[in-house]
Every structure is written in C-alpha cells, then in structure tokens.
C-alpha cells in the first residue's frame, strides 16, 4: 500500500522490528500456556526504545516530559500516546508502502478519523485469538457466528471487522454477516439460527452496541433463541448511529430478546489505536470457571494505568 503525502521515515530496521514482533508473539504464547517468559516491563521498554528511534513523533512526548529512554526500566515510565495524535499524523515505525492494513477510527470526535497502520497482522491475530478463546468461548473451540456488521471485505478499514472475521476463521464455524446496506437482516439471522440448531453448534452474536439497538428495533418485540450455549459480544458506543440506551437496560433487552441469561451478554472494550481487547468476566463466571464479576479483564500483554 502507498499513501499520498506520507511523511518520509528514517531508515526502517525491518529485522529489529520483526524480532520484536516475534518476542511479543512468544510472550503471548507463554502467558497463555502458563510458562515462564520474559517480563512485561523488559519487553515494553525495548519496544518503546525502538519506537523512539523511528522519529514517528512519539519522541516529542519523551522530550516534553524530560524522559531519557536509556533510563527506562518499567512500562509505567513510558509516556502514553494521546489518541488525538493518530488523527494528526502517521504513527508507525515502518514506511507506508509496508502497510498491510490501515484501520480507521469512527471519526465521532470532531469528524476527524485516526489511523492505525499495521505491517505484521499476525501479532494482532495471535493476541486477539488467544484472549477471545479465554474470555468469549473457553467452553468450546468451535461455534457459529452471527455478526451485526457488514462483511470485512466491504469495510476493510474496520479493526472490529478484521477481528470478527479472524475469530470466525479461528473457530471454524459458519459466519453470517447480518448487516446489508446498513440494515439488520433478521431473516438471515433466523436462517443462521436454524442451521446452527440443526448442527448442534453453539452460537455467538457479535457487534457494536448501536447494531444491537437496530436489531431490537427490527424485531419489533419478537424473540429469537440463540440456544442453550448462545452468547453475545457487544462493544463500543452508539456513535450517533442509533438512539442511546442505558447499558444495563440494553443488556437486559438483548438477553430477553435472544432468550439467554444476562451473564451471556459480554461487553468487550477495544480501540482502533490498540491491538488488544478486554472483556467482562461475566461468561466465565456463569460457566463456573471463576467467581462471577463485571470487571473488564485485560490480557497479560496489555497494561492499564491511571
């Protein structure tokens, strides 16, 4: 891919970049297997130093805070990059011609859209698949998907679409993309439910919160049954695309309309600017795998600071 007017980068060290990607993937694998791995801090610090040398604009944050990258020892010492920066400039070490994906934000703030360029999507896939299997479907490795979103091929700049498309591939079930021309296709959903029931496959329905509002409106009070092991993943806000519904009320309406327990409605937190996702612990609690709770759980390769 190329991008008109892209900023010229300093010489990009591809082998060093790839070595960092491989370390991240190894860290993910070791964490999921419960094996000893290098520390989060040492990996994060090495990534920060590499990014500093790339002259992406991140180095200005260090200079503004008078931080010497050579003295970094903890991830908490690395300055956070404001999301607005992704709207104002390209944030990537690699040159634009090495982009394999360019994920764009929704542009709900001031109409500007941030961009997250990706060179090696395998690292993104590794973390996404690992944590989804832990939080969304720890009880099965195969399930069918009903996606309240347009097909990823029609929205190639959507990080959510990329994630959903990849999780469908990882779980080897059938995928039904149930949004056509901006409209929720209830008939397609009904057919997908029938087929999954005939094959005795568990189902997950996934999409943004506003898409579930559209689904509820399209149902007009009718109910659908996701089945005994059915679950829902909802994410994001309403982004001005539907009426706003209070979170608890929406959860209850979804559960009632799809005939599933409220703990089977799992909220996901993700951002285009991030490569990792956090999930509520409701479903794992309902399955008896841990104490039920409503907190968002981050993967070991993601750190939240306040």
Which residues make up each language-model segment?
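Active-site glycine/GP-rich loop and adjacent strand/helix microenvironment
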Residues: 2-28, 38-50, 142-144, 151, ...
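Secondary-structure edge/capping motif, primarily at the C-terminal ends of alpha-helices
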Residues: 31-34
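Active-site diphosphate/adenylate-binding microenvironment
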Residues: 38, 50-104, 111-119, 124-125, ...
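Phosphate- and divalent-cation-binding pockets in alpha/beta enzyme and binding domains
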Residues: 57-60, 159, 214-215
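Glycine-centered flexibility sites
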Residues: 66, 107-110, 236-237, 270
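Internal, well-ordered alpha/beta segment that forms a basic, Gly-enriched binding/recognition surface
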Residues: 103, 108-109, 117, 124, ...
């Amino acid at each position: 891919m190329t991008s008109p007017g892209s900023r010229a980068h300093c010489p990009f060290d591809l082998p060093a970049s790839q070595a960092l990607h491989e370390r991240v993937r190894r860290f993910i694998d070791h964490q999921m297997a419960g094996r000893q791995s290098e520390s989060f801090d040492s990996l994060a610090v090495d990534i920060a130093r590499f990014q500093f040398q790339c002259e992406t604009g991140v180095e200005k944050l260090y200079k503004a805070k008078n931080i010497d990258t050579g003295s970094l020892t903890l991830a908490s010492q690395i300055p956070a990059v404001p999301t607005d920066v992704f709207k104002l400039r390209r944030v990537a070490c690699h040159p634009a011609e090495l982009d394999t994906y360019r994920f764009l934000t929704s542009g709900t703030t001031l109409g500007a859209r941030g961009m997250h360029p990706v060179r090696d999507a395998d690292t993104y896939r590794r973390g996404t698949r690992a944590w989804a299997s832990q939080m969304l479907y720890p009880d099965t490795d195969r399930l069918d998907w009903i996606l309240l979103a347009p097909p990823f091929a029609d929205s190639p700049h959507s990080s959510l679409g990329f994630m959903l498309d990849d999780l469908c591939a990882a779980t080897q079930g059938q995928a039904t993309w149930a949004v056509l021309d901006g409209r929720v296709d209830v008939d397609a959903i009904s057919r997908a439910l029938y087929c999954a029931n005939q094959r005795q496959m568990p189902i997950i329905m996934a999409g943004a919160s506003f898409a579930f509002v559209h689904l509820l409106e399209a149902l007009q009070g009718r109910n659908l049954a996701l089945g005994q092991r059915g679950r829902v993943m909802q994410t994001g806000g309403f982004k001005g695309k539907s009426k706003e519904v209070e979170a608890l009320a929406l959860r209850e309406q979804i559960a009632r309309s799809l005939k599933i327990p409220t703990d089977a409605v799992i909220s996901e937190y993700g951002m285009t600017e991030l490569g990792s996702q956090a999930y509520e612990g409701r479903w794992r609690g309902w399955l008896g795998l841990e104490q039920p709770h409503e907190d968002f759980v981050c993967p070991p390769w993601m750190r939240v600071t306040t």
